[in-house]
Amino acid sequence: MPNGSDEKISVAPIIAAIEAPYLSDLSERDKPWDKHRKNTDKVSAHYRGSEFNVLADRTSFCSEFLDFRLTPGDEGELRLKLSTARFCRVRHCPVCQWRRSLMWKAKAYKVLPQIVEKYPKHRWLFVTLTVKNCPIAELRATLTWMNESFKRLTKLKDWPAQGWLKSVEVTRGKDGSAHPHFHCLLLVPPSYFSHGYLSQAKWVELWQRCLRVDYQPVMDVQAVKKGAQPMSLVPELLKYCVKESDLVADREWFLELTRQLHKTRAIGTGGVLKQYLKELEEEPEDLIGQEETGEPDEGHLYFGWRKREKKYKLVDY
């Protein structure tokens, strides 16, 4: 799974240093590094001069230097794999958010086949639960209310899932409001589609009842085809809590977001899936990716962040 980069490179390090001084020139797959690090500079600038000045310092030094190992590919070509980097681990750092998502996805891809093997006849639902937009200053209270409502939902007699994975996403409204919503992967028994099926209208009714509101909330319910694997849903489930364009769009909105989401959880698990996926609820210790044991090391390439150029450039070490 994601472990630096698997992009194949058919050039020797010396030639690469002369003809392709930037990471993005060497590895197509590693181009996202430039985008995420550029946005990290913007986030750092947002934090500067606020009560989060310490976060400004931490993000400004995040992933300034990347050490990639050169490893042989199947056909003798060289591949880049991230070996060493220092991350700030600030929750809303775009680089760390990206790396965290990669690690979460890697764990999910590893564990989900075990669940499918354990429950081969069960089916999967992908459910999105929403509420009306709220002022950004009321985001924490809104999420608390949504989590309490979700807990009520799971205790209803009609609740069909035997296990679930829930992630939080917050998007920025055009008027500066916040739109929090849940993405949920539900494991349901085979009988769900024969005599326990819930229509879209019924789902809306149940969610409205648990929210205790006088409007019909917007929902989306999709069933994974019979025999299909749930892995295709992982990217949507475990992508990010707040997309980068929203993080950098407005400084005051972003600072309030930081206050509102402080010490809140982005991922929750329950039912029979908790024992398999509980690790996703915690901050991953490893943001690089475990190395494959016994893999040959053909040398290293080092890249430093160049703020003016907004690119990672090959450097001597």
Regions found by a protein language model. Give the residues of each.
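Right-hand nucleic-acid polymerase module
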Residues: 1-178, 188-317
